[in-house]
A protein has these predicted regions:
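One-carbon transfer enzymes
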Residues: 1-246
């Protein structure tokens, strides 16, 4: 464990998406002494415009122009479910490149960490970490474990992890804002899954060989009413999970 010591975070650029991104944005809007100077123009753009009327909307946070904006105007770039991998020129433009990740790092690096926590039977949770060029490999600031219940599917676990993410940001904000916060590198190897692996795992062939437990874990991991879920030979399925009556 070490202490990262940089200048206080008084001006912040927010890259936020989805429900967790909105929760983070609303929390940051309530912080005295913090100015959100820009935000990514994602699905949240109309709401972020109302929360931060003086901030500029950024279409592409990978450009040299955005990096120059950060060097000039921001102490921190804060990512909350941003779907873009930021290049080194952006990560190096502020002393505090911070990401909120819906996985208990080093497990769940990459795409769909809550789903893979079920499929892999690996730890689930959320993590605040410093961003580096390698995806989800930066030093960990703080993390919060979320138990995987026997009746969880991908959607229910994702919802509980989202609540934990909002709590983690609130708990750690005073340290982050001061510019002085603990960091550490995990000793465990953890897991990584890219997008292609997730898409492939959701499209099984009838000839695929696996145990009943592996099939059940994979099916419930990708059970989520927000998309089609897992399929076998083109037939989609979702599991309905409940504990046995005693």
């Amino acid at each position: 464990m070490s202490l990262f010591a940089g200048r206080p975070i008084k001006r912040l650029s927010l890259l936020a998406r989805g429900g967790v991104g909105l929760a983070v944005a609303e929390f940051l809007a309530s912080r005295r002494g913090l100015e959100v100077v820009s935000y990514q123009a994602t699905d949240l753009a109309p709401r972020l415009r109302r929360l931060f009327p003086r901030a500029k909307a950024v279409k592409d946070p990978t450009t040299a122009a955005y990096a120059a904006h950060l060097r000039r105007d921001a102490d921190c770039v804060f990512s909350a479910h941003c779907a873009v991998v930021l290049p080194p020129r952006v990560l190096d433009a502020t002393p505090h490149p911070i990401n909120l990740h819906p996985g208990y790092l080093p497990w769940g690096r990459g795409y769909w960490p809550t789903y893979w926590a079920i499929a892999d039977r690996s730890p689930a949770g959320c993590t605040l970490h410093r961003m580096v060029a390698l995806v989800d490999k930066g030093e960990i600031i703080a993390r919060k474990r979320v138990p995987v219940l026997p009746t969880d599917d991908g959607q229910t676990l994702t919802a509980r992890v989202a609540k934990a993410e909002a709590v983690l940001v609130r708990e750690m904000w005073a340290d982050l804002a001061s510019g002085r916060y603990p960091t550490f590198r995990p000793r465990e190897k953890g897991t990584y899954h890219d997008r292609a692996e997730g898409l492939s795992a959701r499209r099984l062939k009838g000839s695929t060989r696996m145990t009943a437990r592996q099939f059940t874990d994979l099916a419930r991991a990708f059970t989520d009413t927000r998309f089609d879920g897992m399929s076998v030979d083109g037939v989609y399925l979702r599991l309905s999970l409940h504990e046995a009556k005693k």
